[in-house]
Curated annotation (Swiss-Prot):
Source organism, top-level taxon: Eukaryota
Transcription listed as a keyword: no
Protein name: RH-like protein IIR
One GO CC term on file: plasma membrane
Gene Ontology biological process terms from the UniProt entry: ammonium homeostasis; ammonium transmembrane transport
Membrane topology: Multi-pass membrane protein
Family: Belongs to the ammonium transporter (TC 2.A.49) family. Rh subfamily.
Subcellular location: Membrane
Amino acid sequence: MSSKYPRSVRRCLPLCALTLEAALILLFYFFTQYDASLEDQKGLVASYQVGQDLTVMAAIGFGFLTSSFRRHSWSSVAFSLFMLALGVQWAILLDGFLSQFPPGKVVITLFSIRLATTSALSVLISVDAVLGKVNLVQLVVMVLVEVTALGTVRMVISNIFNTDYHMNLMHIYVFAAYFGLSVAWCLPKPLPKGTEDKDQIATIPSLSAMLGALFLWMFWPSFNSALLRSPIERKNAVFNTYYAVAVSVVTAISGSSLAHPQGKISMSYMHNAVLAGGVAVGTSCHLIPSPWLAMVLGLVAGLISVGGAKYLPGCCNRVLGIPHSSVMGSNFSWLGLLGEIIYIVLVVRHTIWNGNGMIGFQVLLRIGEFSLATTIALTSGLLTGLLLNLKIWKAPHEAKYFDDQVFWKFPHLAVGF
């Protein structure tokens, strides 16, 4: 006898997704136009390459990074692509509407596509905490709310604190982490008895997740430098990120071996620890004056990530119901906080070096930005979690958590489940 849960998704998903897509097409028809300026060909190619790197990070990197579940790897990869495609469309419109007053035609440029892709990346980070417990209709709601909340944070911080695009982007780590953890806290937590093994990682899916981590590792310098305008700052960001993630790999392997009683290396530790340096230096990557400092940050971040992978999953599983293998959000929250602290220290150093006496004011500004982003992330995440609990979304039953068979057609299982 087949389950009733796929049938409910079949009724809700096409209506919801296609109606939303039709609405987006109409909005693009009435309110958007392409940039008609004659851009330098060399600059156009360079800008496209950065955008291409971001798309690879999002579609392949984060898509496969979340695919380590034993019975939920198909959904993790495909749902991530679905959220990316939807999130980019909505983010382009939202960023255009919020950046101009009174609202008019949204001019689409390669830079606006890069900005929209970074907004969609926020969803791919936060969804790690809830994948396996929600269906695509709920993910549609989550994408719309989170992209809107992040766009609002960017606009408010930019207007109040006069912050540039790069600094707004670097709040994404903390924002996405706390948003995802807040949503997870509102969802049903424990798995039913007899199904606890479904949220465990398996060998082949874990290898796919490592493939995603490798793509992220290769393209993280492009992500940290994507929205910087100055060529010198972009160069510094690329160099410092490269050194930081290189040290993170060495630290991840060594720390994982050290954390195991028999000195064995854990693949689950590797998935996020190899990226730790890139997250930690993201906020200040263009300000770090020397490679040794970036390398030290990569070392510290790698140790924090390995320690978090060892000790945080038990706490997150008990309190938030997050699977032991889904520690990206909790890791990114600590690493993002470390990055914010390093940025404040470097800003203070720069202020003293230039003889500017307003050190306290600069520190208060940075703390204000961080506090505002965190507050909006927690608030909007809680509201989203409560919204996703409504019965109208036809959420999968707890017994069907972390199960591809709820959503996918398996030719060798014609009878159902």
